[in-house]
Swiss-Prot record:
Gene: glgA
InterPro entries in UniProt: Glyco_trans_1, GS/SS, Starch_synth_cat_dom
Protein keywords: Glycogen biosynthesis, Glycosyltransferase, Transferase
Catalytic activity line of the entry: [(1->4)-alpha-D-glucosyl](n) + ADP-alpha-D-glucose = [(1->4)-alpha-D-glucosyl](n+1) + ADP + H(+)
Xref: Gene3D superfamilies: Glycogen Phosphorylase B
Name listed for the protein in its UniProt record: Glycogen synthase
Binding site for ADP-alpha-D-glucose: K15
Role, per record: Synthesizes alpha-1,4-glucan chains using ADP-glucose.
Family: Belongs to the glycosyltransferase 1 family. Bacterial/plant glycogen synthase subfamily.
């Protein structure tokens, strides 16, 4: 099968979050499964700076962006058997960042038009075209409404993956003519309109042949008013083509036996290296070096979406216990300030690190006993899977991918891979935290068994790849 991915970011070239991880990993797994895979990404200035000497020029042409004629260069490289093509236009993509400009609508309108028009020129007409989030969600619409006259594109099947429904790409309806060069009929009849705006995500949901999300629970949740971001009734209407597939993690990269960022390696049969990493981490972040105290890790953006309003409200109560917490992250200044203040009040119990440090993050995943992740909503989440890979038990709010990946501790069977609570409130966070502390202190054999179960969980991309192939084969024989 010929499969083409089109996305706004993709590791290792450009990455701001989980979308970049997916584009960096899933195509590689599909190639291993015997498929011909290509990826189209924007050619950002950070790609030029880090990988420019590994990327070759292929061709260039002009793209009509409404009344504008814009330069489009095509560049190319091959990595892990995947052919990466890059759309080059320095005006749109040399901004020092991926998102956040006032003209993001124009930037990604150009990108989508260029990606479609590039397919014939690079001689890669896919059987299946996989687009991701709102930045590329107009492509299924454009293929059927603007480019339907191109015979080579007639049989292309499309899949839209929603990584985060909160970001929908809502713009003025004038963009249809001014940028995409299409008529207003589909806006006037309500197909593309939502809240008196052109909604790119709605277009993708209606026009893609299949819609996937990054976990089965999130696929269900976005059909409810609580999580549907005002598109729940559209998703319910299209529910027959909506499904969820849990993202994977790189099992080779996140491997406690070989991880180059760790001082000591370990496995599920011998956790002595984990204990040594714990002592090393305690020393590094300025906490007393104690093997007996439960060490809780947090690696996250400090936002309300991640549940940190509830954490801050619970923190004084939690820190009354004989416990240590190490936090790494940035975000809302109010939460940054709150954690910094608590660290001054409880210097032997809380280490607050308002920064981003890849090595420290890896050490937290590997060295801690518990990993706190009480997200208000979480389409998939990767941190809880990384933590489990290293025998660090997640404590999570039961939403989205957290519900699908963390098996809550069952005290009757002594089974599970972590701890969870259903109602996001200080009471239930504290109650679940107490359950975990009691198990850690009084039932070490059960705790050790949970660690082993967590480390044996299969979150590899090979597993996720099989689910995506089932989805693809439902469209392409």
């Amino acid at each position: 099968m010929k499969i083409l991915f089109v996305a706004a970011e993709g590791a290792p070239f450009s990455k701001t979050g989980g979308l970049g991880d997916v584009i960096g990993a899933l195509p590689k797994s599909l190639v291993k499964a015997g498929h011909e895979v290509a990826v189209i990404l924007p050619y950002y200035d950070m790609v030029e700076a880090k990988f420019g000497n590994q990327i070759e020029d292929v061709l260039h042409f002009e793209v009509s962006v409404g009344w504008r004629r814009q330069y489009c260069g095509i560049k190319k490289t091959v990595l892990n058997g995947v052919t990466f093509y890059f759309i080059d236009n320095q005006y749109y993509f040399f901004r020092g960042h991926v998102y956040g400009d006032f003209d993001d609508g124009e930037r990604f309108a150009f990108f989508q038009l260029a990606a479609i028009e590039a397919m014939e020129r690079i001689d890669f007409i896919p059987d299946l075209l996989h687009v991701h989030d709102y930045h590329t969600a107009m492509i299924p619409f454009l293929l059927k409404e603007k480019y339907r006259w191109i015979q080579a594109y007639e049989d292309i099947e499309t899949v839209l993956t929603i990584h985060n429904l909160e970001f929908q790409g809502q713009f003025s309806e004038g963009m249809l003519g001014d940028l995409f060069g299409v008529g207003f009929e589909r806006y006037a009849d309500g197909t593309l309109r939502w809240n008196n705006c052109l909604n790119w995500m709605k277009a993708g949901i209606l026009y893609a042949n299949r819609v996937s999300t990054v976990s089965p629970s999130y696929a269900h949740e976005i059909m409810t008013s609580q999580f549907g971001c005002n598109l729940d009734h559209i998703l319910k209407m299209e529910s027959g083509k909506v499904s969820g597939i849990v993202n994977g993690i790189d099992a080779d990269l996140y491997n406690p036996q070989t991880d180059a960022l760790l001082d000591y390696h370990f496995n599920q049969e011998d956790l002595s290296g984990k204990a040594k990493n714990k002592a090393k981490l305690q020393e590094r972040v300025g906490l007393p070096v104690r093997a007996d105290v439960p060490l809780v890790g947090i690696v996250s953006r400090l936002t309300r979406q991640k549940g940190f309003d509830v954490v801050v409200e619970s923190l004084h109560h939690i820190l009354q216990e004989d416990v240590q917490i190490v936090l790494l992250g940035t975000g809302d200044p109010a939460f940054e300030g709150a954690f910094s203040w608590f660290a001054q009040i409880y210097p032997d119990k809380l280490s607050t690190n308002i920064t981003f440090d890849v090595k420290l993050a890896q050490e937290i995943y590997a060295a801690c006993d518990l990993f706190l992740m009480p997200s208000r909503f979480e389409p998939c989440g990767l941190s809880q899977m990384m933590a489990m890979r290293y025998g660090t038990l997640p404590l999570v709010h039961e939403v989205g991918g957290l519900r699908d990946t963390v098996r809550a501790f069952n005290p009757i069977e002594g089974s599970g891979t972590g701890f969870s609570f259903d109602n996001l409130s200080p009471y239930w966070l504290n109650w679940t935290f107490q359950t975990a502390l009691d198990l850690y202190r009084n039932h070490p054999d059960i705790w050790r068994n949970l660690q082993k179960q967590a480390m044996e969980s299969d979150f590899s991309w090979d597993t996720a790849c099989k689910s995506y192939l089932d989805l693809y084969h439902s469209l392409v024989n």
